[in-house]
């Protein structure tokens, strides 16, 4: 093989390697894959009325948010799906959050109280705003606490 072809082969080899897809910026499926289409996030919670906001967060209108509870256990499956999901609702908070329930802003990691998410609930009469508080685990806990304070106290 002539000596002039070795440098040419080295240059072509380096060129081929430098146009590769680096780990940091590769799309799923490689550099020639199609972009991921967003799909709605999985349903969760009692009666599948909520949506998964993260691997252990399930929130829905009228039911509030469940974090790390059995109602949110099905949200772990989102991690194993290849295409990303998109949660509807208004954008809120500082970390790509979305309004999950009246007054609650959630992202994939956590939920926070956010007044930007109260607009929808302000239109409801006060009796309907607080009716969801008495449903589910929050209502059970509130009733237990009220019952515990009414018990006879030792003298």
From Swiss-Prot:
<keyword id="KW-0165">Cleavage on pair of basic residues</keyword>
<dbReference type="InterPro" id="IPR000981">
    <property type="entry name" value="Neurhyp_horm"/>
</dbReference>
<dbReference type="InterPro" id="IPR022423">
    <property type="entry name" value="Neurohypophysial_hormone_CS"/>
</dbReference>
<keyword id="KW-1015">Disulfide bond</keyword>
<keyword id="KW-0732">Signal</keyword>
<keyword id="KW-0027">Amidation</keyword>
<feature type="disulfide bond">
    <location>
        <begin position="41"/>
        <end position="85"/>
    </location>
</feature>
<feature type="disulfide bond">
    <location>
        <begin position="44"/>
        <end position="58"/>
    </location>
</feature>
<feature type="modified residue" description="Glycine amide">
    <location>
        <position position="29"/>
    </location>
</feature>
<keyword id="KW-0372">Hormone</keyword>
<feature type="disulfide bond">
    <location>
        <begin position="52"/>
        <end position="75"/>
    </location>
</feature>
<protein>
    <recommendedName>
        <fullName>Vasotocin-neurophysin VT 1</fullName>
    </recommendedName>
</protein>
<dbReference type="GO" id="GO:0005185">
    <property type="term" value="F:neurohypophyseal hormone activity"/>
</dbReference>
<feature type="signal peptide">
    <location>
        <begin position="1"/>
        <end position="20"/>
    </location>
</feature>
<dbReference type="GO" id="GO:0030141">
    <property type="term" value="C:secretory granule"/>
</dbReference>
<comment type="function">
    <text>Vasotocin is probably an antidiuretic hormone.</text>
</comment>
<dbReference type="GO" id="GO:0005615">
    <property type="term" value="C:extracellular space"/>
</dbReference>
<comment type="similarity">
    <text>Belongs to the vasopressin/oxytocin family.</text>
</comment>
<keyword id="KW-0964">Secreted</keyword>
<dbReference type="Pfam" id="PF00220">
    <property type="entry name" value="Hormone_4"/>
</dbReference>
<feature type="disulfide bond">
    <location>
        <begin position="99"/>
        <end position="117"/>
    </location>
</feature>
<feature type="disulfide bond">
    <location>
        <begin position="106"/>
        <end position="111"/>
    </location>
</feature>
<dbReference type="InterPro" id="IPR036387">
    <property type="entry name" value="Neurhyp_horm_dom_sf"/>
</dbReference>
<feature type="disulfide bond">
    <location>
        <begin position="59"/>
        <end position="65"/>
    </location>
</feature>
<dbReference type="Pfam" id="PF00184">
    <property type="entry name" value="Hormone_5"/>
</dbReference>
<feature type="disulfide bond">
    <location>
        <begin position="21"/>
        <end position="26"/>
    </location>
</feature>
<feature type="disulfide bond">
    <location>
        <begin position="92"/>
        <end position="105"/>
    </location>
</feature>
């Amino acid at each position: 093989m002539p000596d002039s072809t070795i440098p040419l082969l080295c240059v072509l080899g380096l060129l081929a390697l430098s146009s590769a897809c680096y780990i940091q910026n590769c799309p799923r499926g490689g550099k020639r894959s199609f972009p991921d289409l967003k799909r709605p996030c999985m349903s969760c919670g009692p009666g599948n009325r909520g949506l998964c906001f993260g691997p252990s967060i399930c929130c829905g209108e009228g039911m509030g948010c469940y974090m790390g509870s059995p109602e949110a256990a099905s949200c772990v499956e989102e991690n194993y799906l290849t295409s990303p999901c998109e949660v509807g609702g208004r954008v809120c908070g500082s970390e790509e959050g979305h309004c999950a329930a009246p007054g609650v802003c959630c992202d994939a990691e956590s939920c926070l109280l956010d007044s930007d998410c109260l607009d929808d609930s302000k239109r409801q009469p006060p009796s309907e705003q607080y009716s969801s508080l008495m449903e589910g685990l929050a209502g059970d806990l509130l009733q237990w606490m009220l019952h515990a304070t009414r018990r006879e106290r030792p003298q």
